[in-house]
From Swiss-Prot:
Family: Belongs to the paladin family.
GO BP field: angiogenesis
Primary location: cytoplasm
Keywords: Cytoplasm, Lipoprotein, Myristate
Source organism of the structure: Danio rerio
Name of the protein: Paladin
The UniProt record lists the keyword Ubl conjugation: no
Length: 860
């Protein structure tokens, strides 16, 4: 019966069009009949009641899924009522509490912390309003003469407006653990608007299950009288953000609304900058070619409280207004200048940035001016320095108890510094692209200037200021290389150094870090009657501190993570050598027993003799006059920076110009990853100088996923198709990799094969999945860089490589789309790249330099 009733034939469109009046009258009669209990029968089934009437023309079922939906319930504490939870987890909390309105503007303007920025620009900021409050804000702007208003809602978290008395008040879902904190990244890929629609339906369903009532929380400070009931009779009692902010367009034709979700800390993502630029392109009144006789539009920015994100929006708006009016507005007063003097200390990363940007100093000063004009409630630069001072004010003695506090202030300082960094970058983009009507999006422009990402990844250079007495005070320990570099190739007995090897038929050698004795043995070996190398270039690839103490090589490490090296990020060789000299002086001066970690055990040792690596090789030069020693720091698991390639090529060119038969020796801590990378680079370079050998045809590899073992990943093959003679470029790199790895099979380290090996481990090692995913991508990136470097050697050979690799990447490879490939780097054969942020240059390079070790130095 139920099935028959629900499947009753429907009137055709033609019949319905010609019988509207009859149908309406019949419906009213049928409805009246039902309510007068004149129905013939009411038949129920598991789906819903089926109502059949006398002389019926229509049969219908009521489908209501509310009772069947698996909604969850919960409570904040045992003495509070239990009720349904939004999205199965969250409580609905009144969005803005009264104390948040620091400027006390809700009563007068309708919005908390409503204000206009300085400089006379039509820029306004505020916190979250109610529906009625927003109408009052718009009326206030119209009263001030602003007919054209562009409003930006900067919130990424969902907000819904619930009907209460004569207004609709904003509420947001919050977690039980922190009722004060907004949700972030609630669902991957879901827009804020979609989430709000889902929440509205849930709230309506909850109310239907509870006599049209739902529980909300207004006082989360004391929870007195909470939760409170609010009446929801229909979905019309709930507004979403879009409904509140888009509808004024019908009464204000010159009004525009945009939702531009910004992060609560740190810099926005490139896509968010792109969305802002799209607004500039869409609105003629924000074009450089606008009608100058017309007033500038008012830009209104709003977040929750009207402080952090609103401040960022106001600064972006100020930069736009500066470009539109071609002025930096009025000069700062002497009093203001005096206040800002204390913050003229510049960070290294900012100095490097403005040093490379066109008109960098001017670009930065404009950003500083914009920050000053918008600093009534929040100052980004002030935030950096406040966090820096608090971070460095926490004493080393309280490291164990205070590590979380240090992490908190370090995170705050770096997030504010990143935001400041991106504002300078964005202003540089405006300088270049505003006159071009934004022919290039911000994300495209930034991708073509990938050196900016390199700088960003090295914001934290605190190790350059780490105290020299950390070891003598017990905060760090000395770890012997014998513990860090097992001699897998069994070469210590003969050569006195671990993992010594040679590229077959070439004068290229690699090894772990040698002692002074081992270095002397290696040099004697290279210059004997059999090999007869008259000159030797020795390159140390280490980017951490090293010392030879009591005839052993030691590195300072954190006592809880002795296997993790402490990189001196973005350091010049001179910086590392200076730190090593300070550490040596401290060790010799202390004359105390120190804990050291050896291969099998920990011991207490007194440091009686100590030398830096530079001193070791200076001494060796007295007996080997043709020895050249260079330190070129390479990262452990990834490709060298573009400048790293430059440095290695330059020193090889200079050496070969003097002696074409020179030996090239490379070492890192264990003779593995960095040494192998440098040996491959040297092999390719020498082949270009001396000619390529004949390569045998590819062997048929009978192993699972053989093409991935051979490096034929989709992103690699895209690069191969992009490069001139790309197949040959890859084939030559593969030959170099195979040649270098031929004598190191026991190390189980092949720069190409390790890519897929590492990726396969991700599923089996859940605890280290994120680290393995990063390593696999960095290995893949390193392989791609080797192919790019080989292409550079081919294409620039005619000019003897006068143009450095770093410049070639910027001038040639970047416009060709190489960095766009690297900005979508991933294993698209196995996964959706949208599911991983590590595919992006910004995230990957930042994560590469995050070591998670205790903060020991100072932000510089």
């Amino acid at each position: 019966m139920g099935t028959t009733a629900s499947a009753a034939p429907q009137a055709t469109l033609h019949e319905r069009l010609h019988s509207d009046s009859m149908t309406d009258s019949r419906r009213s009669i049928q409805t009246l009949g039902i309510h007068n209990n004149k129905a013939k029968s009411i038949i129920t089934n598991k789906v819903a009641p089926v109502v059949i009437t006398y002389n019926c023309r229509q049969e219908f079922q009521i489908h209501d899924d509310v009772l069947r939906t698996n909604y969850k319930v919960g409570r904040i504490s045992d003495n509070m009522p239990e009720h349904h939870l939004v999205q199965g987890s969250f409580f609905m909390v009144q969005d803005v509490f009264s104390k948040a309105d620091v400027l006390n503007t809700t009563a007068s303007y309708g919005a908390p912390n409503f204000r206009q920025s300085g400089g006379g620009f039509p820029l306004y900021g505020m916190g979250q309003t109610s529906l009625g409050g927003f109408k009052r804000v718009l009326e206030s702007l119209q009263t001030r003469g602003h007919q054209e208003v562009i409003f930006f809602c900067l919130r990424e978290e969902p907000v819904v407006f619930l009907h209460l008395q004569e207004d609709f008040l904003p509420y947001t879902p919050r977690r039980k653990e922190n009722l004060h904190e907004n949700l972030q990244h609630l669902q991957r890929g879901a827009s804020s608007e979609d989430l709000e629609l889902t929440i509205r339906k849930e709230l309506h369903d909850f109310a239907k299950l509870n006599d049209n009532m739902f529980y909300v929380y207004n006082d989360i400070e004391h929870l007195k009288g909470e939760p409170q009931k609010i009446c929801i009779c229909s979905e019309e009692d709930i507004h979403i953000t879009e409904e509140v902010y888009r509808r004024p367009r019908f009464t204000m034709p010159a009004y525009r609304y945009y939702r531009l979700p910004l992060p609560m800390e740190g810099a926005p993502m490139e896509e968010q900058f792109d969305a802002f630029v799209k607004v500039l392109r869409e609105n003629p009144s924000l074009s450089l070619n606008r009608d100058a006789s017309r007033l500038l539009p008012a830009l209104l920015f709003s977040c929750q409280v009207g402080v952090g994100r609103t401040n960022l929006g106001l600064i972006l708006g100020t930069l736009v207004m500066m470009h539109l009016t071609r002025t930096t507005a009025e000069k700062t007063t002497p009093a203001e200048e005096e206040v800002k003097d204390e913050h003229k200390i510049q960070f290294r990363v900012i100095e490097s940035l403005i040093g490379k940007l066109p008109k960098g100093q001017e670009v930065m000063e404009e950003v500083n001016r914009a920050i000053d004009l918008c600093s009534e409630m929040h100052d980004i630069r002030e935030s950096i320095y406040e966090n820096k001072q608090k971070l460095e004010g926490i004493g080393e003695d309280y490291q164990t108890q205070g590590s979380s506090t240090k992490d908190y202030f370090l995170h705050g300082a770096l997030q504010s510094l990143e935001r400041y960094f991106y504002l300078i970058v964005f202003n540089a983009y405006l300088h270049e692209q505003y006159p071009l009507a934004f022919a290039c999006s911000f994300s495209q422009w930034l991708c073509s200037n990938a050196w900016i990402y390199r700088l960003l990844s090295c914001m934290n250079q605190s190790e350059l200021r780490a105290p020299a007495d950390l070891v003598t005070k017990g905060a760090r320990v000395l770890v012997a290389d014998e513990y860090l570099a097992p001699d897998v190739l069994s070469t210590i007995k003969e050569m006195k150094v671990a993992n010594f090897r040679r590229v077959p038929k070439m004068s290229i050698y690699g090894m772990a870090q040698p002692t002074s004795e081992a270095a002397s043995v290696v040099l004697a070996y290279l210059c004997d009657e059999k090999r007869k190398h008259s000159s030797v270039l020795w390159v140390n690839l280490q980017d951490e501190l090293l010392l030879e103490a009591n005839n052993q090589i030691f590195s300072p490490r954190e006592p809880t993570r002795v296997e993790q090296c402490i990189r001196v990020c973005s350091a010049q060789p001179e910086d590392i050598q200076s730190l090593e000299a300070s550490l040596k002086a401290q060790l010799l001066a202390s004359q105390q027993w120190l804990e050291v970690t050896l291969e099998q055990e920990k011991q207490m040792k007194m440091i009686k003799s100590c030398s830096t690596v530079q001193e070791i090789f200076n001494q060796l030069k007295s007996s080997h006059h043709a020895l050249q020693y260079r330190r070129i720091p390479f990262p452990e698991c990834s490709a060298p920076s573009e400048e790293g390639f430059d440095q290695l090529l330059d020193v090889m060119k200079a050496t070969l110009a003097e002696d074409s038969l020179s030996a090239f020796v490379f070492n890192c801590s264990n003779g593995k990853a960095r040494t192998t990378t440098a040996m491959v680079i040297a092999t390719l370079t020498l082949w270009h100088f001396n000619g390529f050998p004949e390569f045998c045809e590819d062997e048929i590899v009978s192993v699972p996923d053989a093409k991935y073992t051979k490096g034929e990943f989709e992103v690699v093959m895209k690069l191969v198709r992009l490069l001139p003679d790309g197949q040959r470029m890859k084939r030559e790199v593969d030959a170099a990799l195979d040649s270098v790895s031929e004598t190191m099979t026991p190390l189980h380290y092949h720069l190409r094969e390790i890519i897929i090996c590492t990726y396969r481990q991700i599923r089996s090692c859940k605890s280290d999945a994120e680290l393995l995913a990063l390593q696999a991508l960095l290995y893949l990136e390193r392989y791609i860089y080797l192919i790019l470097y080989n292409s550079y050697l081919h294409l620039e050979k005619r000019d003897s490589w006068r143009r450095p690799f770093s410049v070639w990447m910027q001038q040639v490879a970047a416009p060709a789309g190489v960095y766009e490939l690297l900005n979508q780097l991933g294993f698209s054969e196995f996964e959706d790249l949208r599911d991983s942020t590590l595919c992006r240059l910004r995230r990957r390079w930042l994560q590469q330099n995050r070591h998670g070790l205790p903060f020991r130095g100072e932000l510089i």
